[in-house]
Amino acid sequence: MARIELGKEGEKLAIDYLLTKGYKILEKNFRTPFGEIDIIAKDGNFIVIIEVKRRLSDKFGKPELSVNYTKQQKLKKLALYYISMLKKEYPVRFDVIAINDKKIEHIENAFF
């Protein structure tokens, strides 16, 4: 399976999972001049910035481990950009959804 197809399928699995958990999906593949946020959702009062990582095996490590410090810093900047567009302040949370084959692990508050 091509990398882009794998990512798109992973994002669909993640969205389906989030909807079953009661999240409201606000944005998918939110693009800015600085990069992209996979999913932006609302969970209660929180705006949740969600990075989705999918792998077919652990051969190259667990998917969640690829959300390293550099990626975290980038997501924080992208979140500030998104929040600045809103008319109201919301608490923000950063989650990672790691999918290994089709097994989903949702890591809430993955980083601050």
Curated annotation (Swiss-Prot):
InterPro entries given for it? Restrct_endonuc-II-like, tRNA_endonuc-like_dom_sf, UPF0102_YraN-like
> Which Pfam families does the entry link to?
UPF0102
Q: Which SUPFAM superfamilies match?
A: Restriction endonuclease-like
Domain of life, per lineage: Bacteria
CDD domains, sorted: PoNe_Nuclease
What GO molecular function annotations does the UniProt record carry, in alphabetical order? Answer: nucleic acid binding
UniProt record similarity statement? Belongs to the UPF0102 family.
- Designated name of the protein: UPF0102 protein THEYE_A1950
Recall the taxonomic lineage recorded for the source organism: Bacteria, Pseudomonadati, Nitrospirota, Thermodesulfovibrionia, Thermodesulfovibrionales
